[in-house]
Amino acid sequence: MSVAILVNLKARHGSAQVGEHIRRILPDARVAVTSSLDEARAWVKDELVPHRPSLLLSGGGDGTAVALLNELRDQGMPLPTFGLLGLGTGNGWARATGDVGKRAVLRGLERLSNAGQDLPVRTFDLVETEGRVTPFAGTGWDAQILADYKDTVTKTPRALDRLGGSTGGYLRSLFTKTIPRQLFGERPRVRVVNLGEDALTVDASGKAVPLPGGERGRVLYEGPLSVGGAASTEELGLGFRAFRFAHLVPGRMAVRVYAASTAGATLRMPLLWRGVHPLADDHHFFVTKCRFEFDRAVPFEIGGDLVGERREVELSRHPVPISLVDFRRVH
């Protein structure tokens, strides 16, 4: 098995030391320790395209994995079996296939080194938007919390950060920055239009059912927006199950609009975090393609990275699913 591994030095748990640990565990692997997107692009072009690996592992956060996937697409390289090494901050996607953090990643690679050729995998759909593929994309609190949390991390001394932990830092930024800002601002409004096959929704018991009036061209939702987006994985990171129904309907992406007021959402935060269903003002759809139309420019994030403000975005299910190594079943 030919293995290639990218380690992002800018990821929360990425370092040259981690790269050396990986080389000792997998001495035959091609390991690149990079500090910029340009370095990663050069590695893909010079190393991976001429000599395609059978297994490619992304060491970083969700943004690292998404950037690597899209660079492979841009270079016209067929995607090998992919794996996520959760060395980032939230690690929403990586948590679907294994434990995260430096120690957990190294333990997973130790098991991988003894696993042989036939690795267990999980198949995931991908969301496509603005020419990029991603496990999730959206706006509202998810994008704003992300920006606030990253700002908090950069300004928090490492000793305090270790005491607070990732979840503690996330909640600290949520309650000291994002929520106060939202309490005193008017929420945007959004119209969600179905552009694909007839939409499905979910009933109170969690079962997927046809949505009356959900045909192509129909408005699925119109009203206030606190959080909205599409995903093919359950978590946005740190255990936040923002899309608990992401795998409910194969061949569809899960679209969610949470419309509760800031005060109401704050009171329900533990329920939101765990993905409890049903909740008031919560709207779930399963579609192949849709458009979000906003009444103002809003922050938009793709796979954990903010990409700017948008008045309108289209999201669709990418036609080719991806196979991810399931580290929980690697023995």
Language-model-detected regions and their locations in the chain:
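Short, solvent-exposed amphipathic alpha-helical segments in soluble enzyme
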Residues: 20-23, 73-74, 150-151, 244-247, ...
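Short, conserved beta-strand edge motifs with alternating hydrophobic and charged residues
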Residues: 191-193, 227-231, 254-258
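Aspartyl protease active-site motif detector
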Residues: 58, 66, 86, 228, ...
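A short acidic Gly-Thr/Ser loop motif
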Residues: 60-62, 88, 318
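ATP/nucleoside-binding phosphotransfer catalytic cores, i.e., glycine-rich phosphate-binding loops
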Residues: 5, 202-206, 215-222, 233, ...
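ATP/NTP phosphate-donor binding region
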Residues: 1-59, 64-66, 70-77, 103, ...
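Catalytic core of DAGKc-family lipid kinases
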Residues: 6-7, 15-16, 32-36, 74, ...
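Conserved active-site and cofactor/substrate-binding residues in soluble primary-metabolism enzymes
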Residues: 17, 63, 140, 248-250
